[in-house]
């Protein structure tokens, strides 16, 4: 187990010409399996149309695995990341449902929450693709 960010994706990474500057939004951090962050950043929801770039819409899975394996004692392969990608996609779907429910029951009056709630169907398709159609 290790420290897991919990929402590791491009929107929470600050870079400039000098490279990585910061990783922000640690409110979902917890102790857990570090592969959760790898699966999360590979989720289709964070690719924003760049579906050929499995890692956050900007990188190749092979490069991520090579880099990770070069510095980690834990050796990771595609199948391990895919398991956590399925978990992360399911988790995002549940988060979408919670956001929609908060809007619908009046807890949070927010068009943003309602719009996020509509993304549940995307996670359903992504899980079917990952489990049955050979998706990455």
Q: What label would you give each PLM region?
A:
Residues 23, 33, 87, 120-122:
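Residue-level recognition of hydrophobic positions within alpha-helical transmembrane segments
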Residues 1-36, 42:
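Active-site acidic catalytic loop and adjacent metal/ATP-binding pocket
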Residues 105, 110-136:
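Regulatory N- and C-terminal appendages and interdomain linkers associated
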Residues 51-52, 78-80, 106-112:
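Short, surface-exposed loop/turn segments at secondary-structure junctions
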Residues 35-73, 87-105:
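Active-site activation/catalytic loop segments of kinase-like enzymes and analogous catalytic loops
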Residues 23, 59-77, 122-123, 127, ...:
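Short amphipathic alpha-helical segments and their helix-coil junctions
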Residues 29-32, 58, 110, 114-117:
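Short, conserved loop/turn and helix-capping segments at secondary-structure boundaries
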Residues 75-87:
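All-alpha amphipathic helical-bundle segments outside canonical DNA-binding/catalytic cores
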């Amino acid at each position: 187990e290790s420290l897991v960010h919990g929402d590791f994706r491009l929107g929470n990474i600050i870079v400039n010409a000098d490279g990585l500057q910061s990783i922000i939004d640690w409110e979902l951090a917890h102790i857990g399996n570090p592969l959760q962050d790898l699966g999360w950043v590979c989720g289709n929801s964070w690719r924003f149309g760049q579906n050929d770039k499995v890692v956050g819409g900007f990188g190749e899975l092979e490069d991520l695995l090579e880099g990770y394996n070069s510095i980690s004692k834990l050796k990771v392969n595609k199948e391990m990341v895919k398991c956590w990608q399925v978990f992360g996609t399911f988790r995002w779907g549940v988060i979408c449902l919670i956001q929609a429910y908060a809007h619908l029951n009046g807890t949070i009056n927010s068009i943003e929450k309602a719009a996020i709630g509509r993304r549940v169907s995307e996670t359903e398709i992504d899980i079917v693709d990952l489990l049955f159609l050979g998706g990455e």
